Curated annotation (Swiss-Prot):
Belongs to the universal ribosomal protein uS12 family. GO terms for molecular function: rRNA binding; structural constituent of ribosome; tRNA binding. This is Small ribosomal subunit protein uS12. InterPro entries: NA-bd_OB-fold (IPR012340), Ribosomal_uS12 (IPR006032), Ribosomal_uS12_bac (IPR005679). NCBIfam families: rpsL_bact. With S4 and S5 plays an important role in translational accuracy. Interacts with and stabilizes bases of the 16S rRNA that are involved in tRNA selection in the A site and with the mRNA backbone. Located at the interface of the 30S and 50S subunits, it traverses the body of the 30S subunit contacting proteins on the other side and probably holding the rRNA structure together. The combined cluster of proteins S8, S12 and S17 appears to hold together the shoulder and platform of the 30S subunit. Part of the 30S ribosomal subunit. Contacts proteins S8 and S17. May interact with IF1 in the 30S initiation complex. Keywords: Methylation, Ribonucleoprotein, Ribosomal protein, RNA-binding, rRNA-binding, tRNA-binding. Residues 110-123 have a biased composition (Basic residues). The modification 3-methylthioaspartic acid is found at D89. One of its GO terms (biological process) is translation. Residues 104-123 are annotated as: Disordered.
Amino acid sequence: MPTVNQLIRKPRKPLVKRNKVPAMQACPQKRGVCTRVYTTTPKKPNSALRKVARVRLTNQFEVTSYIPGEGHNLQEHSVVLIRGGRVKDLPGVRYHIIRGVLDTQGVKDRRQRRSKYGAKRPK
């Protein structure tokens, strides 16, 4: 623990809060255009082919965002809406694409947690 004199000489530095989603610029969602749609593999204990898209946002940021749910209709030049939220086992993926909005279709035959995947209520 520092002495009073040490604190006078060199005061305590306030902690800097890092922004986890800088490309959003304090917006809840942002629109963008897919520049590349591809699959990638997760970090060590997990194994899969995760679907991700490189998205060029309206504020000229280029980000990698995750495509949730089973199956998707995205391709290059698809217009998508993204939200913040990282994918723990994909390094560098800090955003999610919102399903059922703009060019992204909702997940087909989804019965539970439908609102998260843009699926309509089944008849």
